[in-house]
Curated annotation (Swiss-Prot):
One MF annotation (Gene Ontology) recorded for this entry: G protein-coupled receptor binding
Gene Ontology cellular component annotations, sorted alphabetically: cytoplasm; heterotrimeric G-protein complex
Cited SMART domains: G_alpha
Protein name per its UniProtKB record: Guanine nucleotide-binding protein G(q) subunit alpha
Tissue: A high concentration was found in the retinal light-sensitive outer segment.
Organism this protein belongs to: Loligo forbesii (Veined squid)
InterPro entries named in the record: Gprotein_alpha_Q, Gprotein_alpha_su, GproteinA_insert, P-loop_NTPase
Length: 354
């Protein structure tokens, strides 16, 4: 009997050892996954960044994938022109060519959210309105209302998009705007390590969904739209400055106890739009603390970078930053290579990389 028990005990011990070995393996494998949380206010460029990761480190977009964006491109175009038509009225601007009043009426009759065709009449009406000096003045005053960044890109290109057999290009896909609701994860494999990038909705109503994303975050990647310094928040009733809202969110994020051990990387995004806008919209008009020269892109972006970095009260916590243009694949390829090296360097031991 003792012999029998001994054999049973040995077998139980062997099973326990196997279980412990598997648990150690699972723990090690879990440590070889890096969770990167993309945060920032609405329209800061998070979804575009995810698309770039798919292009640079994933499977990209096949022709079939690209065809799937066709209707969304049409909807973005109709939405942009309707926003401009509404703003013409709000700003009491008139079309220089009276025939564009009829074009505007026709375009307003389209349901932008469900549009699935793009016909000759649409192109004629859009080109008429968009090239009208009255609407161009309206576009120049876009900080006074909410217009997507991609509006000009699409409206300048309606003839190409209307061509027979049109298939959206990668740039069309990067520019397309679909508000993120809920949480989107995009995992990709680099050097046998899984980078799991998590994009959450940036609008205020979406932020309550973030909470369960906060466990085991390797890095916070916080996106800032540099071009928003003179814009107000679409969700705000009191014309709150969009950059101030972004800074308030950033301050909250970097002080969360969940992120004590997470590195923080700041992406100062939309640098191309800032470079264009700073020539006519002066930073000091919106941020009186700015005492640098007017129309100076370098001075403006440095001031904004400092204003975010100064929010970090924990001087032990390192913040990293990069200036980015999320629609520029080569820029993101270069920046993410540096980010990846930083993250791996910070986690060498924990992720069994040494």
């Amino acid at each position: 009997m003792a012999c029998c028990l001994s054999e049973e005990a040995k077998e139980q011990k062997r099973i326990n050892q196997e279980i412990e070995k598997q648990l150690r393996r699972d723990k090690r494998d879990a440590r070889r996954e890096l969770k990167l949380l993309l945060l920032g206010t609405g329209e800061s460029g998070k979804s575009t960044f995810i698309k770039q990761m798919r292009i640079i480190h994933g499977s990209g977009y096949s022709e079939e994938d690209r065809k799937g964006f066709e209707k969304i491109v049409y909807q973005n175009i109709f939405s942009a022109i309707q926003t401009l038509i509404a703003a013409m009225e709000t700003l009491s601007l008139e079309y220089k060519d009276p025939s564009n009043n009829e074009h505007a009426e026709f375009l307003n009759s389209i349901d932008a959210d469900s549009a699935d065709i793009f016909e000759d009449g649409h192109v004629t009406a859009i080109k008429g309105c968009w090239t009208d000096p009255g609407m161009q003045e309206c576009y120049d005053r876009r900080r006074e209302y909410q217009l997507t960044d991609s509006a000009k890109y699409y409206l300048d290109d309606v003839e190409r998009i209307h061509e027979p057999g049109y298939i959206p290009t990668l740039q069309d896909i990067l520019r397309v705007r679909v508000p993120t609701t809920g949480i989107i994860e995009y995992p990709f494999d680099l050097y046998s390590i899984i980078f799991r990038m998590v994009d959450v909705g940036g609008q205020r109503s979406e932020r309550r969904k973030w909470i369960h994303c906060f466990e085991n975050v390797t890095s916070i990647m916080f996106l800032v739209a540099l071009s928003e310094y003179d814009q107000v928040l679409v969700e705000s009733d009191n014309e709150e400055n969009r950059m101030e809202e972004s800074k308030a969110l950033f301050r909250t994020i970097i002080t969360y106890p969940w992120f004590q051990n997470s590195s923080v990387i700041l992406f100062l995004n939309k640098k191309d739009l800032l470079e264009e806008k700073i020539m006519t919209s002066h930073l000091a008009d919106y941020f009186p603390d700015y005492d640098g020269p007017k129309c100076d892109y370098e001075a403006a972006r440095e001031f904004m970078m400092d204003s975010y970095m100064d929010l970090n009260e924990d001087k032990e916590k390192m913040l990293y930053y990069h200036y980015t243009c999320a629609t520029d694949t080569e820029n993101i390829r270069f920046v993410f290579a540096a980010v990846k090296d930083t993250i791996l360097q910070l986690n060498l031991k924990e992720y069994n990389l040494v």
